[in-house]
Design a protein with these regions (language model features):
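Hydrophobic residues on conserved beta-strands that form the core of alpha/beta folds
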Residues: 55-57, 73, 93, 112, ...
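A short alpha->loop->secondary-structure connector
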Residues: 128-135
Length: 809
């Protein structure tokens, strides 16, 4: 072995031996002076305390603090001077390990380099008056010059906490922070310029992080694990926590913070960021009052969240909360439905207007560039804004372009069923939020629908190639550019509703929709479904009513005022031209006003009403008929239910006034025997053609007269209609065949009883008489037949002599 190696080994051996001798001496010294050392340590630790620190016993543990001297203090308690009043011990530790500087110890002084607290409870208490048991620690008087004769306070370089319960209980500020610290290790560096820098490694269970105990705790029962770098500046009193990754539960967070201890109530700002957290996991970290609201929603994929908490440790309410969330291509579940392909940037604050405090009333949510798809309908909202979470109000601009058939996914097919066509929507809205759903939205903007096929299911009415433009203003609704096509019918419409949205939500019965309707051609048979019974009934509106139910109720209860102009109207055999009408549609029926049409060379005007009762429709009509071709008139209305007298038997021009009521079926047919009322008529240039009841009698009585073409110069009369029976008021018939006085009852079943007084003289003999009085006097000259038309045994009308006539007439 080389000589230098031997020398080196000897030196090392001497040093080791010297160290062992020193430690043996120290051990002997500590054991010999245990009580005095315990007293010295206690005095040192009590030096700057407003209270008492007591130590039960002390045991040396040299190897743990090598090369320093370690001492284990058992049953350590620390109580402030007012402990008897509040009964909250600041520190109660079963074991406290202290490592002291060896050289200082040999000099007779104590310099603490490390302290460890095991199996302990730390309770920082502040009562309702603001007094805290941390008052045990005396504040340094910065104005007082340091006395060289005074020894400095002990500096702690390292510390550890194991199995420590740490509580901050602030009764005045309604705050409760409670942690079960499994393991905490820290290294502290004290720069020459003052302050300190610390590196910490933490593993703790958060039992409570309640900034307002009346609201509940954040991150309750969550495990926190991770490192911290903390610095403190003596001059500013600011504690700075550098951003580091801290695991809260199973989610990593980047957390940084700042605490300003120079203020009477320490102010704090905590910055939190997580790049990949599920919505429900994030909501579970918040206070229960916030969690309950957020859990009404859900996002399927993780999101990126930034959060800043700010406040102070003094009395007061909640901390300020500012949250920013980034959502992309996610699935959003809401109480109102599911939004697919959802992307947006969201912001939340509980102090929206500066100076108005922190509260739900001053809270706001903003959603920027919101895009998604609801029930396969894509839409976007540039900026959605919700403020005042106590009575939340949502505003925004809703935009969407979609195939209109997709509306069936939202409103169902019970009322409106959509086929092809497109919709373009741009609406600014303002709505209350009740139970996390938009309620009573007020909208402003446009809805355009083009080339759409729509079926109105309750009435079985179908429209093709429909167009409509809805313009919502602040108060009113304007409906423009409407094109409806049902079969051969094409209708162009424009409408308006005053005070629409207000009445829609509060009193739909008062809604009055004004329509201007124009059409080149309408086939009424294609709209016959409006006479039928509606399949679904309108339900009483509730908070849970869906859009379809509310719209259905609107259609049922609102009033519609129509001004109609139609070039041609077809119904079965009926054709009218130049039609004009004013209709008022209400929940109870239809009021018909100022109706005028051209028909069969003349005109028809009418007023009346239609009331629906189940599967039938009761109508009342007052009509004025002027110069209408009676043949076409009877043909158009299927001879008004008569089988004996038809359009083939009639000729002439009809002038008439009627006051009639009746019943139409849901198929649009006049129900037999349902007509009641009166008909006054004047038939000019009339003729009765091949009318069998006349021919059957006339071929025997008047074999040489023309029975196939019986002409009338003027025929006036009045009929009273009572269902199956028509009362023929006494009337005179002056024809080319014969003259006749007629009166009685014509029945469409049984009960016909018509008296006929027929002079047999040929009316042509009086054709050249111009004097009306003379013609009237000669009218009944000669032989007069008194006949009675009544029911025969075979059910047909039979003509016989009227032997029981009133002979005084």
């Amino acid at each position: 072995m080389p000589r230098w190696s031997k020398i080196t080994l000897k030196v090392i051996g001497i040093l080791i031996g010297l160290i062992l001798i020193i430690f043996s001496a120290l051990a002997l010294y500590v054991n010999s002076n245990k009580e005095s050392l315990l007293q010295t340590i206690t005095q040192k630790l009590n030096k700057n305390l407003n209270g008492t620190l007591t130590i039960g016993s002390m045991e040396p543990t040299f190897l743990r603090g090598f090369p320093g001297v370690s001492i284990k203090l058992l049953k350590v308690t620390m109580r402030d001077s007012l402990w008897k009043n509040h009964q909250h011990t600041l520190l109660d530790a079963k074991e406290l390990e202290v490592s002291v500087n060896t050289l200082s110890l040999l000099k007779g002084t104590v310099e603490i380099k490390k302290i460890g607290i095991n199996d302990a409870a730390i309770y920082l208490f502040t009562d309702s008056n603001g007094y805290s048991n941390t008052a045990i620690f005396r504040k340094k008087d910065k104005t007082k010059k340091k006395d060289d004769s005074e020894s400095s306070s002990p500096e702690i370089r390292k510390f550890t906490l194991n199995n420590v319960s740490f509580v901050v209980d602030n009764k005045k500020g309604h705050k409760l922070f409670q942690f079960e610290i499994y393991d905490l290790k820290g290294n502290i560096d004290c720069p020459l310029l003052g302050g300190w820098d610390a590196e910490l490694k933490l593993k703790t269970l958060a039992k409570s992080l309640a900034f307002n105990t009346r609201r509940g705790s954040f991150i309750k029962d969550k495990l926190l694990e991770g490192p911290f770098k903390v610095s403190y500046n003596d001059n500013s009193g600011i504690v700075q926590v550098a951003p580091n990754t801290l695991n809260i539960g199973n989610d990593p967070f980047i957390i940084g913070a700042k605490f300003d201890t120079s203020k009477e109530n320490t102010e704090f700002t905590i910055n939190i960021e997580t790049k990949n957290i599920l919505w429900r996991d994030a909501s579970a970290l918040l206070a229960p009052n916030i969690t309950a609201k957020l859990n009404m929603f859900d996002l399927k994929q993780p999101i990126h969240v930034y959060c800043t908490l700010g406040g102070n440790m003094g009395p007061g309410g909640d901390p300020s909360i500012n949250v920013k969330a980034l959502v992309k291509d996610n699935t959003l579940t809401t109480p109102g439905g599911v939004v697919d392909n959802c992307s947006f940037t969201g912001q939340f604050t509980n102090s929206y207007i500066s100076g108005k405090g922190i509260s739900d009333e001053n809270s706001a949510i903003k959603l920027f560039n919101f895009k998604g798809s609801y029930a396969q309908i894509p839409f976007s909202i540039d900026t959605a804004f919700i403020n005042n979470l106590n009575k939340p109000i949502a505003t925004g601009i809703f935009k969407s372009q979609f195939e209109i058939a997709k509306l069936n996914n939202i409103i169902g097919e019970e009322m409106l069923k959509f086929g092809k066509g497109t919709a373009n929507v741009k609406l600014a809205y303002r709505a209350d939020i009740v139970d996390f759903q938009l309620t009573k939205p007020y909208v402003k903007g446009l809805v355009d629908i083009q080339n759409a096929d729509v079926s109105y299911v309750p009435r079985k009415v179908n429209f093709k190639n429909t167009a409509i433009s809805l313009n919502f203003t602040d108060h009113d609704l304007y409906i423009k550019n409407i094109r409806l096509q049902s079969g051969k019918s094409v209708v162009f419409m424009e409408g308006s509703v005053g005070n629409f949205l207000n009445l829609y939500y509060t009193d739909p019965e008062k809604i009055l929709l004004n329509w201007k309707i124009r059409s080149p051609e309408i086939h009424l048979g294609e709209f016959i479904g409006f006479l039928g019974t509606r399949k679904p009934k309108a339900k009483k509106r509730t908070r849970q009513s869906n859009f379809s139910e509310n719209l259905n109720e609107l259609f049922e209860k609102s009033q519609v005022n129509m001004n109609i102009k139609v070039d041609k109207i077809y119904y079965s055999k009926f054709l009218a031209t130049n039609a004009n009408a004013d209709l008022l549609l209400t929940e109870n029926g239809i009021a018909i006003k100022n109706v005028s049409v051209k028909h069969s060379g003349g005109s028809v005007s009418l007023n009346g009403s239609i009331a629906q009762k189940g599967s039938t429709n009761n109508f009342k009509l007052n009509t004025v008929i002027t110069n209408v071709d009676i043949k076409n008139f009877f043909y158009s209305f299927n001879n008004f239910g008569m089988k004996t007298l038809t359009s083939k038997n009639l000729k002439g021009y009809l002038f008439s006034t009627t006051n009639i009521s009746g019943v139409i079926s849901d198929k649009g047919n006049l129900l037999p025997n349902s007509l009641y009322g009166s008909i006054a008529f004047n038939l000019k240039k009339g003729a009765l053609l091949s009318f069998d009841p006349i021919k059957n009698v006339g071929k025997f009585a008047f074999p040489f007269r023309d029975l196939d073409n019986i002409t009338f110069t003027n025929l006036n009369g009045k009929f009273d209609v009572r269902g199956q029976k028509i009362t023929i008021n006494p009337m005179q018939i002056n024809s080319s065949l014969l003259n006749m006085d007629i009166a009685g009852i014509y029945s469409m079943s049984t009960g016909t009883n018509i008296t006929l007084d027929i002079p047999l003289r040929n009316p042509k003999k009086d054709a050249d008489i111009t004097d009306k009085d003379e013609k009237r006097a000669r009218r009944m000259k000669g032989i007069v037949l008194h006949l009675l038309a009544t029911d025969g045994e075979d059910g047909k009308i039979k003509i016989k002599l009227n032997r029981n006539r009133d002979k005084t007439k």
